[in-house]
Amino acid sequence: MLLVPLLLSACGLSDDESGGAIDTVKIAAKTEVPAGTKLVVAEQNGTQSLPWNLANAGQGTPYEVDFADFSGGAAVIEALRSGAADVGSIGEAPVPIAVDSGVTDLVTIGLQANPGTSGGYYLVARPDSGVRTIEDLRGKRVAYPPGSGRHMVTAGLLKRHGLDLRTDVQPVELAGAEVVPTFAAGAVDAAIVLGNQYYQLGEPPILGDGKGINTGIQTLIVRRDVLDDPAKVAAIGDYLGRAVAANNWKDTHADQWVDQYYVKVQGITFEQGKKLYEEDGIASYYPIDEQSTALFQTVADGLHETGTIKGRVDVSPFVDGRYNDIVTAQNELDGVTPKSLKS
């Protein structure tokens, strides 16, 4: 794999489109990729393509990149396994859940984390429910999307206060998109919602958030046999480096990111988006090493403890650090030092 320095000029978006002039995006390393190579990246809600396009990180790529949007981690995984996509962007829970169900052909090649933050997860109560504390949820209806990071945070918050999600409350399992309308209709007493949803619901009482439970892990995954294709391996390495650069761009262009993502995609005000951004910041990319793998393992362990998965899953066979040098080089070029993962 040949790595050479590359400077990409981030032009192509006007000041009106981007919320201000974009600075030059620098890419630490470029991989030599055979002509005609194509990558399809499966994402959710534009979380890969939006920063990629805003930062113009794809300028000069020696391969074709197409983004395809899916609803939920399970759909992304299915796209990878069917061959409809080469790279998938998902959260912390889907890989351990898939492994527990017998899926062994996936591997994580990129990992972001943001431990110590809420993760934008809020357990909220209906104002008319009589619920003021988590302890008040005993016997109450609590909505969450099963098999997700929100599921794990909900169970973890209840456990901290002496309650078991499976036995001490009435668990209401819903698809992610159904949680907010169900809560708004008064069909449940409490629900775990995302930051933008909290504001869209009119700022209901917050009982707890993801701090101390959330890892902020987001993963880039591939089907294992894709790593047997030298052309794809080269293209994926180059893509990952550019994805790190695009992610780091967000932190140096915070107002533009808030406007483009929180306001235009998530549908909340600039002030609300800025507050969410300032509370949690950006999940940095980390090398896949002993420390980041250990953090990922806490997710699998948490899913088992909450009963989301039946068996204990060892995540170490499902991570691959072959691109660590690319991640480290890009972070160093951008002056990014990810927070320590040591407990």
Residue ranges and their predicted role:
Residues 18-164, 172, 209-214:
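Short, glycine-/small- and polar/acidic-enriched structural segments
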Residues 301-343:
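Conserved C-terminal helix/tail region of periplasmic/extracytoplasmic solute-binding proteins
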Residues 89-102, 155, 185-205, 295, ...:
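A ligand-binding cleft/hinge motif common to bilobed small-molecule-binding domains
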Residues 12-15:
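Bacterial signal peptide processing site
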Residues 1-2:
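N-terminal export leaders
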Residues 93, 171, 177-266:
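Pocket-lining segment of extracytoplasmic ligand-binding domains
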Residues 230-310:
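Secondary-structure end/capping motifs
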Residues 6-10:
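C-terminal motif of bacterial Sec signal peptides marking the signal peptidase cleavage site
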